[in-house]
Amino acid sequence: MLYAGTSGWAYPGWKPDFYPAKTPAKKFLEVYATRLNSVEVNYTFRRYPSEKLLAGWIASTPAGFRFSVKANQLITHIKRLRDARELTQRFLSSLQLLTEAGKLGVVLYQLPPFLKADAALLSDFLGLLPAAVRSTFEFRHDSWFTEEVFTLLRQANAALCLAESEKLVVPDVSTANFVYYRLRKPEYSAAERRQLAERIGAQLAHERDAFVYFKHEETPEGALYAGELIQRAAG
């Protein structure tokens, strides 16, 4: 299954090309979910979501919609995965409503660029994560891109986050029964979009779910690209 969207939805500048011109801000997510079937939430990086907030998200989206969420910075940037059992359990517990509704996609653990590879640290942290919750790791230091790290991810069914970066080339390696793409360029040519669709199609052919998120911008290109990708996959 392909889940495609952007890293956010609250952008008035997406009117009228993505949202109808008269769409009020409180209806953005509801309209977004009629065109795309997933979104990546960065809000959770700084704050734990309240039950009221999650209930609103759930009510605004249809069955089959998925919210992928960025793990809280206390886990990834303050503790840097070390001695983070209590924080991780608390964070995952805060997502319980999404889990119960069947709308939790993937939890993204985005590590700081100065954090170098530490296989023992990663192994210990992976041991904290419940198998029922999909996890992906965005490594932003190239020392992490080793077979030892890939093996640890495979053993935990955790995905290597395939994130675009001007400073780093992430190897296109599958380590789980799903893949996770963070596409950060502001624009993609028709040829690039076609190549991307072929890559995603190959993953789907191997029965891997694909979570694909374009960069959020004040203009709607990313959302439109995601919609095009869904149409290609369906077609």
Segment roles from a protein language model:
Residues 1-235:
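Residues lining hydrophobic/aromatic ligand-binding pockets adjacent to catalytic sites
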